[in-house]
Amino acid sequence: MDILIRPGDSLWYFSDLFKIPLQLLLDSNRNINPQLLQVGQRIQIPGYVTTSYTITQGDSLWQIAQNKNLPLNAILLVNPEIQPSRLHIGQTIQVPQRLTWRLVNGQQNYDYSMMMNDIKKLQTAYPFLQGTPIGNSVLAQPIPEILIGNGSKRIHYKASFHANEWITTPIIMTFLNDYLLALTNQTTIRGLSMGPLYNQTTLSLVPMVNPDGVNLVINGPPANEALKNKLIAWNHNSQNFSGWKANINGVDLNDQFPAKWELENARNPQTPGPRDYGGEAPLTQPEAIAMADLTRSRNFAWVLAFHTQGRVIYWGFENLEPPESQTMVEEFSRVSGYEPIQSANSYAGYKDWFIQDWRRPGFTVELGSGTNPLPISEFDTIYQEALGIFLAGLYL
C-alpha cells in the first residue's frame, strides 16, 4: 500500500499508526533516507492493501474508521484529496485493510506461471521482499530467487529440482506467505516470534529450480513439434510425463554437480531421459549452473534442498560434513518426525557438492510419502511436517 508523506510524518509515526515493525518499513523503502523525508514523497506500507468503500447516508470518516477498527489518520493518508467535511453519498474512498490471509493458494497444480504470479503479488504486498532471477532455464524462463530477512546469517532453501516433485514449490511458497503474515501482524508460528528470526537471518529461496520440467509434468509437452517429439521419444514413447524428473533437455539436475560426478555417471543412463541422466559433464545445464553460481556468490551457512518423497533427511556426504550437521538433523527430525539418514549412497547432488566444497551443513529433505508426483490432497499433511523444518532452519 502506498501513501504520500505529509508535513511532520515519519517512518516511526507510520510504524506506530499501522502497527508494523519499523525494520519492515525501513526495508520496504530502501531507496529512501528516513531522516530526510520530503512532503509528497511516496512511501510503501507492507502488509496492507486498500479496498474501495462507497459513502452512504450519515457516513463520516470517523465512523468508517471506528467500524473498520482503524485510526482516522490511516484513512486520511490513503485519501489525500478528500475533504472530510464534504463527503457526499455515492462517493468512493479508499480504506486500508491489513492483510491477514494468504495470497498463495498452493493446493492446485502449481506451474511456473502460478508461482511467478504469486511472487509478484507477494512483492507488491510485502515490498521488503527482494528478488532477482539467478539465471534462465533451457526455455529461457527466468529462475527467481527471493530474499527475506535482515540478518548476517545467510541460509538457503530450494525446491523443484525434480520436475515431478513440483509440490515442493507451493509448499515453500506457502511457508514464505505464512512467514510474511507473522512478521507484519506480529503473530507467532508454533509459538515462535518471527521478528527476531528476520533480524538474525537472511533467507534465500529458489522455489522452482526446474521450471521447464515442472511445466512439462503439469501441462504436458510444449507446442514446438520437434521438441515435443524428442521429449516423447526420451520418455520411452509415452505422452504421460508424470514420472519425469529431469529438465527439458532430459538431464537430471540433481546429478549435475561436481561431487564424484564420475561415479554417479558410471551407474546411470548415458542418454537423455526422464530421470538419472547426469549430462555429458558436471554443470552443463543452465539451471544447475545458475544454482552453482548463486551458491558461490553467497556465503550460505547451510542449505536445504526440498524433494519428495520418503519422509527422510539426508545429511552427510563422504564424512565431509561438519559435526554440527548431526545436531541440526536431530532437531529437524524432532520437529518433523522424519528419519535422519547420513548417506544416500549417491553422488553429484547439490547437497553433496555444497558439503564437499564448503564443509558446511547441507541437507536433502524428502517430503511426504507415496509415489511422485504426490497428490495435492496430501498438501496440508506435508506442509505441517515441513513447517517445523522450515522454522528450525532459521532458528538453529
Curated annotation (Swiss-Prot):
Active site: Y347 (proton donor), E366 (proton donor/acceptor)
Annotated signal sequence range: none
Domain of life: Bacteria
Annotated residues for binding of substrate: D255
Function: An endopeptidase which hydrolyzes the gamma-D-Glu-(L)meso-diaminopimelic acid bond of L-Ala-gamma-D-Glu-(L)meso-diaminopimelic acid and L-Ala-gamma-D-Glu-(L)meso-diaminopimelic acid(L)-D-Ala peptides. It is active on spore cortex peptidoglycan.
The record's note on its domains: LysM domains are thought to be involved in peptidoglycan binding.
Name the record gives this protein: Gamma-D-glutamyl-L-diamino acid endopeptidase 1
Species the sequence originates in: Lysinibacillus sphaericus
Lineage of producing organism: Bacteria, Bacillati, Bacillota, Bacilli, Bacillales
